[in-house]
Amino acid sequence: FDSVISKFENEIACFISSPFHHPTSEDNVLPKKGYWEHIQKVCNEKNIIIIVDDVRTGFRIDLAGSNKAFNFSPDLVCLGKAIANGYPISALVGKNYLKESANKVYFSGTQFFNSAPMAAAIATINELKKIDATSLMNHHGNDLKSKMISMAKSYDIDLKVTGVPSMPYFRIENKDQELHFKWVDNCLSKAVSYTHLRAHETCHN
């Protein structure tokens, strides 16, 4: 990051990133302590906009956005259908100082006046606040993680769990991954999916 900024600082408009590395079928990597604070400091100094992709992580880490948990303040945040419990809707939220620039850009869409997803989003957000959804999903995730690890140990299996509790990734550690793939296939045959990132929902218990 620093070397790129140093080399191209006058050509960089924004820094776009997910809050942490969370590919669907690989170990997740959380940011090191101070990572986002450093990104924030440099971007502020160089007048670079920070854009966070919270489509997958939005509301799972904190209802105020994943950035709150990682202690930084992005300029723009992208959110997806999770804000409406699966209804087709997305949102780009940001700081007030960007509104003037946004108003200069023509932007239109077929679904702009589709009231059902908007009503669903309001109802979903209200419900998430009411039930403290983030705490609930983290509780389920931690419970699943501890029980899965305990069960794996009883069979002398090294189960690696990465990511945040509300969306963990499970992987059996072995040299050629053969055991992991057999486990995944067997789970699928029983209608249980561990092929990729395990995203918890408040209805899971």
Question: Which residue stretches match the model-derived regions?
Answer:
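Short beta-alpha connecting loops at secondary-structure transitions
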Residues: D75-C78, A102-T110, K129-D132
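Active-site PLP attachment segment
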Residues: F72-S101, F113-A120
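Helix C-cap/helix->beta junction micro-motif
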Residues: E45-K46, Y155, K190
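Conserved PLP-binding catalytic core of the aspartate aminotransferase-like
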Residues: G141-K145, A152-N186
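Structural signature of PLP-dependent enzymes
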Residues: T124-S146
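Conserved PLP phosphate-binding loop immediately N-terminal to the Schiff-base lysine helix
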Residues: C14, S18-K32, I48-F70, L76
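Single conserved hydrophobic/aromatic residue that forms the stacking wall/gate
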Residues: H196, H200-N205
